[in-house]
Regions:
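Short inter-helical turns and helix N-cap capping residues of alpha-solenoid HEAT/ARM repeat scaffolds
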Residues: 291-292, 322-323, 354-355
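Extracellular ligand-binding/catalytic regions of CAZymes and related secreted enzymes
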Residues: 23-27, 99, 126, 212, ...
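A glycine-rich, often tryptophan-bearing local segment used as a flexible ligand/cofactor-contacting loop or short
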Residues: 84-163
């Protein structure tokens, strides 16, 4: 028994040593930036990796992959957007390079469209690397919003911060409805199951998304693949789940993130955008162009409360609105939604702010946002 215990300890140390030798001081993560990847999804994925003190992150293009950039990475992430368009942008030779990269012992994470790209879905351009296939693809535009999921036993090991919760909540945006592939013999493990029935748009049928895999994970050659049909990177308090997925693909130990980073209590209910909500959301675009300061602030309040998907693309310029009250509210929106992609904009806004009280308030919001990042 003692000999067996010593052997296990030695093998664990050897594995950790090999991991350390392979990546140096930091794990190198590449986020694919190509046609088909939504810009905000790319920004948010980068920001999520920045939460992990043991990781560095960069974007890579299809040309970078062809030029050998994968040799300088430990893991690749295919972000949200449009999976088939990313397939077209990558090209078949680059996708084979990615497959070989994973087979060699590296990691890959697919988020929403990226997870779709990884599937084996008939009639859809995909890579056949995660053992799942998407169904009901004719209703992909089924809707979006904060959605519930429950962890499986394996998922609780990977995300122990959520293990005692019956349900947790993250952003879902028309992700694939997954079942096991019947043509690719590649078993996967469901790490979480979706609990929300999303059918707000596109005449999508009811009872299609609920009780389906939310996160799946599988071996691929010597490497690993993790697929998320949802957007933790776009969910305040849950962004840390993305670097944790990367850790799983690389067989890295689970490490704790700060309480500022891990905050699942920000959302404790479903918030699905109805057709009426979407119409109201679209109207606020014009409010930010032509509305009064009071109207702009009311719009920001509503958009933040319903976790608007589109608002994050509109709020950046409000940091430099003519109204000090709007500038302060925009800073609070960015800080309270953990929107690290606009950190440099908030820093610039604080530097040029002339109103003393507004500047003090904006500086507090800036410090709140910066507290997400690990200490250097």
């Amino acid at each position: 028994m003692l000999r067996k215990t010593i052997f296990i300890i030695v093998m664990c140390l050897v594995g950790l040593s090999a991991w350390s030798r392979g990546v140096g001081n930091k794990v190198r993560v590449g986020v694919f930036q190509g046609n088909g990847g939504a810009q905000t999804c790319i920004w948010e994925t980068i920001a999520s990796i920045q939460l992990d003190p043991d990781m560095t992150v960069r974007t890579i293009t299809t040309g970078d992959i062809a030029n050998g950039a994968l040799s300088d990475l430990d893991a690749i992430i295919i972000p949200g957007g449009e999976g088939a368009t990313q397939y077209m942008n990558l090209g078949e030779e680059n996708m084979e390079r990615i497959r070989n990269f994973i087979r060699s012992g590296k990691g890959a994470v697919g988020i929403c469209a990226g997870a779709y790209l990884f599937t084996d879905t008939p009639g859809y351009a995909c890579m056949h690397i995660n053992g799942g296939k998407a169904i009901d693809i004719e209703h992909d535009n089924r809707g979006h919003g904060i959605s519930a999921f429950s962890l499986t036993a394996e998922g609780k090991k990977l995300f122990p911060e959520l293990a005692n919760r019956d349900r947790s909540y993250v952003m879902y945006y028309e992700g694939p409805v997954l079942v096991k592939s019947d043509s690719v013999p590649l078993p996967y493990t469901a790490m979480a199951m979706m609990e929300t029935d999303v059918h707000e748009e596109g005449n999508a049928p009811a009872n299609m998304t609920n009780n389906r895999p939310f996160f799946i994970a599988n071996e691929y050659g010597k490497g690993r693949v993790f697929s998320s049909i949802s957007h933790p990177e776009a969910t305040p308090g849950m962004m840390w789940m993305i670097p944790r997925m990367v850790r799983w693909t690389l067989r890295m130990p689970v490490v704790a993130y700060s309480k500022r980073v891990v905050n699942p209590d920000l959302y404790n209910r479903e918030i699905l955008m109805t057709k009426a909500d979407l119409k109201k959301e679209r109207g606020y675009y014009n409010t930010f162009l032509y509305g009064s300061p009071k109207e702009k602030i009311a719009a920001l309040d509503w958009l933040q409360n319903c976790r608007s998907w589109d608002a994050k693309r509109w709020v950046q310029g409000l940091l430099f609105d003519n109204s000090p009250a709007v500038r302060e509210r925009a800073a609070r929106f960015i800080a309270e939604t953990d929107y690290l992609p606009f950190l440099s904009d908030l820093e610039a806004a604080c530097r040029v702010e002339r109103n003393v009280q507004t500047k003090q308030s904006m500086m507090r919001h800036l410090e709140h946002l910066k507290a997400l990042l690990p200490h250097k």
